[in-house]
């Protein structure tokens, strides 16, 4: 019997990640057939440059797929089975400010962590809710697979503000680290490992890694990470210097709890001074991306569109993003795939807030995810997570209530911020920088000396 084929819209069609994801989808058509693929963005000029290349890819590799790029929500979201969302409200220019403003005060400037992550979250909530509402209006049976950052804040916003929506929040960072673990172990794929992991998004720990026969792989991995971080003896592909530093720093992060293996983002919370020291406030990661990947992808897309051929293209398939197909297949075909998702705790972690959005392994089928019970977690992780989940909840409350006070409290609670005064100074700058993107906050009347 012929498999059903699906209609997909990629929300954030103008993203520089879109071409690699489209190539990945075209590479997995046997497992996940597609009849229609649409790109949606509110920036027509940007999306058109990406879409020109994607149109060529599809005509060359799968001409039967109906392709469209649109800025019209009704056209984009009508007759779709899956919405794949990777939006960036404010683009990289705003990310640069998210990073630069905290650094001005000697505080971590990072895309998803600390004040920068809070600022990005405040911009992202409205955009993700808007896409979710379009999907429910025009294709009420569809599922939204959201990998827009900052995933923790976005997931809390959808839990609180759209509690009955068919949205799955997923992150690629654990996937990327597990790819590196597989390389370290000499395995051909991360899928040869069975993992146990818990935490919040960008804030978690692996507690068990086994092979398919049940052999414990943790001792070998822990020994390697304690010496080299997540850097394999031989790299499978070239890694940017800033990412190389991150993977090496896992050595120090792991030392805080040698019984587990950490998510690399914990470096920003456990070693914030080190992160600030190696940052350039005038040239942050956002600048690197704009000058590097963004310039490269757009020049490649322009060339492909001009030549109407991908023969000379250097854009690579984003194999790393194949987890998106795994997730879509799990929903479509009830595969029972085991995946890390960001879901409401609801007892999965016994001694933690039941309403917190936690990142844990789930079994995914046609009705969505079923979290695998983690049990009781240690005081060290519990304490860190309680502080961080409070930051996320207060940020969403601040957005919903337009509350300056609650947003200030979120920054005060962030482990990256040293005190309330610095939190206030950063927030006042962020409010000014984000006036075109955030809700207008009720300016707190309370002044500090």
UniProtKB/Swiss-Prot annotation:
EC number: 3.2.1.122
Regulation: Cellobiose-6'-phosphate and 6-phospho-beta-D-glucopyranoside are not substrates but competitive inhibitors of GlvA.
Residues engaged in binding NAD(+): 6-72
SUPFAM superfamilies referenced in this protein's UniProt entry, alphabetically: LDH C-terminal domain-like (SSF56327), NAD(P)-binding Rossmann-fold domains (SSF51735)
InterPro entries according to UniProt: GlycHydrolase_4_CS (IPR019802), Glyco_hydro_4 (IPR001088), Glyco_hydro_4_C (IPR022616), Lactate_DH/Glyco_Ohase_4_C (IPR015955), NAD(P)-bd_dom_sf (IPR036291)
Gene Ontology biological process terms from the UniProt entry: carbohydrate metabolic process
A GO cellular component annotation in the UniProt record: cytosol
GO molecular function, one term: oxidoreductase activity, acting on the CH-OH group of donors, NAD or NADP as acceptor
Binding site for Mn(2+): 171, 202
Pfam families the UniProt entry points to: Glyco_hydro_4 (PF02056), Glyco_hydro_4C (PF11975)
Cofactor note: Binds 1 divalent metal cation per subunit. Manganese, iron, cobalt or nickel enhance activity.
Swiss-Prot/TrEMBL induction comment: By maltose; repressed by glucose.
Family: Belongs to the glycosyl hydrolase 4 family.
Assembly behavior: Homotetramer.
Protein name as annotated: Maltose-6'-phosphate glucosidase
Biological source species: Bacillus subtilis (strain 168)
Lineage, uppermost ranks: Bacteria, Bacillati, Bacillota, Bacilli, Bacillales
């Amino acid at each position: 019997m012929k498999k059903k084929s699906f209609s997909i819209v990629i929300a954030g069609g103008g993203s520089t990640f879109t071409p690699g994801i489209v190539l990945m989808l075209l590479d997995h058509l046997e497992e996940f057939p597609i009849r229609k693929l649409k790109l949606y963005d509110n920036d027509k000029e940007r999306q058109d440059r990406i879409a020109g290349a994607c149109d060529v890819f599809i005509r060359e590799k799968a001409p039967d797929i109906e392709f469209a790029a649109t800025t019209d929500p009704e056209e984009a979201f009508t007759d779709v089975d899956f919405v794949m969302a990777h939006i960036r409200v404010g683009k990289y220019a705003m990310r640069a400010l998210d990073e630069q403003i905290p650094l001005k005060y000697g505080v971590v400037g990072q895309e998803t962590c600390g004040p920068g992550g809070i600022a990005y979250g405040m911009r992202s909530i409205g955009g993700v809710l808007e896409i979710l509402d379009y999907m429910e209006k025009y294709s009420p049976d569809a599922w939204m697979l959201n990998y827009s950052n900052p995933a923790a804040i976005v997931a809390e916003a959808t839990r609180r503000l759209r509690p009955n929506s068919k949205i799955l929040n997923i992150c690629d960072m654990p996937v990327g680290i597990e790819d590196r673990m597989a390389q370290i172990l000499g395995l051909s794929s991360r899928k040869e490992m069975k993992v146990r992991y818990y935490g919040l998004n960008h804030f978690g720990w692996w507690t068990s890694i086994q092979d398919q026969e049940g052999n414990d792989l943790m001792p070998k991995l822990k020994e390697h990470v304690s010496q080299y971080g997540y850097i394999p003896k031989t790299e499978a592909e070239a890694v940017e210097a800033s990412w190389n530093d991150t993977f090496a720093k896992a050595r120090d992060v792991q030392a805080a709890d040698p019984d587990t293996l950490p998510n690399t983002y914990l470096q920003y919370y456990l070693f914030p001074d080190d992160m600030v020291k190696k940052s350039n406030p005038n040239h942050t990661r956002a600048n690197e991306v704009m000058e590097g990947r963004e310039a490269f992808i757009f020049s490649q897309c322009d060339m492909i569109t001009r030549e109407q051929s991908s023969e000379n293209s250097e854009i690579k398939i984003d194999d790393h993003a194949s987890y998106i197909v795994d997730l879509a297949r799990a929903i479509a075909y009830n595969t029972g795939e085991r995946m890390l998702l960001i879901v409401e705790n609801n007892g999965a972690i016994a001694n933690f807030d039941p309403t917190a959005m936690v990142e844990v392994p789930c079994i995914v089928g046609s009705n969505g995810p079923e979290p695998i019970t983690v049990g009781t977690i240690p005081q060290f992780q519990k304490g860190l997570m309680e502080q961080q989940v409070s930051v996320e909840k207060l940020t969403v409350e601040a957005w919903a209530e337009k509350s300056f006070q609650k947003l200030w409290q979120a920054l005060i609670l962030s482990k990256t911020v040293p005190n309330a005064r610095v939190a206030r100074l950063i927030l006042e700058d962020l409010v000014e920088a984000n006036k075109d993107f955030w809700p207008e906050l009720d300016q707190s009347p309370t002044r500090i000396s």
